[in-house]
């Protein structure tokens, strides 16, 4: 078993970061995620948003793994459960693979919280537990997978910034459009008075 952990601070408020986290896929930074399906989404009586999603991924595999499973590329599926608590301002996301579970398990946990000293920033704490089963090189493979997870986490943070930039651009566009819509009737009314 290999445990990988990371902490990152986003220079954006919690509301922005959690909105982006829910819209992270697809993105150009991590094209291995080829599909996201929402299986269930509901708000519980306390106001927490619960989501259960299925992520479809396609990976190019290292040669040692190819020889073990007999494939060069493989589609895998990951189940993801998240809980967003708008009162406590926390988002906890847990994911686990549901493909190849007889060979490997990857359990990941992400927690987004406002930065304790700066509410305009958000802290992401990330942990992955990797277990390769039934292979004599399991420790080596777990290390290799931890390295891949670390690289993908970096891509994931880039993707979050990309989504946040995209969301901000959409907000600016909608704001500009709304201003134009408001001005047009006002200009017409002013013209009609003349």
From Swiss-Prot:
<dbReference type="Pfam" id="PF04707">
    <property type="entry name" value="PRELI"/>
</dbReference>
<keyword id="KW-0597">Phosphoprotein</keyword>
<feature type="modified residue" description="Phosphoserine">
    <location>
        <position position="51"/>
    </location>
</feature>
<dbReference type="InterPro" id="IPR037365">
    <property type="entry name" value="Slowmo/Ups"/>
</dbReference>
<protein>
    <recommendedName>
        <fullName>PRELI domain containing protein 3B</fullName>
    </recommendedName>
</protein>
<dbReference type="GO" id="GO:1990050">
    <property type="term" value="F:phosphatidic acid transfer activity"/>
</dbReference>
<comment type="similarity">
    <text>Belongs to the slowmo family.</text>
</comment>
<dbReference type="InterPro" id="IPR006797">
    <property type="entry name" value="PRELI/MSF1_dom"/>
</dbReference>
<feature type="domain" description="PRELI/MSF1">
    <location>
        <begin position="1"/>
        <end position="172"/>
    </location>
</feature>
<dbReference type="GO" id="GO:0015914">
    <property type="term" value="P:phospholipid transport"/>
</dbReference>
<feature type="modified residue" description="Phosphoserine">
    <location>
        <position position="46"/>
    </location>
</feature>
<dbReference type="GO" id="GO:0005739">
    <property type="term" value="C:mitochondrion"/>
</dbReference>
<dbReference type="GO" id="GO:0005758">
    <property type="term" value="C:mitochondrial intermembrane space"/>
</dbReference>
């Amino acid at each position: 078993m290999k445990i990988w952990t990371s902490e990152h601070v986003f220079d954006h408020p919690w509301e922005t970061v959690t909105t982006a986290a829910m819209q992270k896929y697809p993105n150009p930074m991590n094209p291995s995620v080829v599909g996201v399906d929402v299986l269930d989404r509901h708000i519980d009586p306390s106001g927490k948003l619960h989501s259960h999603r299925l992520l479809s991924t396609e990976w190019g595999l290292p040669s040692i793994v190819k020889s073990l499973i007999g494939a060069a590329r493989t589609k895998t599926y990951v189940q993801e459960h998240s809980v967003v608590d708008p009162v406590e301002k926390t988002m906890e996301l847990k994911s686990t693979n549901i493909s190849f579970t007889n060979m490997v398990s990857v359990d990941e946990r992400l927690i987004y919280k406002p930065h304790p000293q700066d509410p305009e920033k958000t802290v992401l704490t990330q942990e992955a537990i990797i277990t390769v089963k039934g292979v004599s090189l399991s420790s080596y493979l777990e290390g290799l997978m931890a390295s891949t997870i670390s690289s993908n986490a970096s891509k994931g943070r880039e993707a979050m910034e990309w989504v946040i930039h995209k969301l901000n651009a959409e907000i600016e566009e909608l704001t500009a459009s709304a201003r134009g819509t408001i001005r047009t009737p006002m200009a017409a009314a002013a013209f009609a008075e003349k």
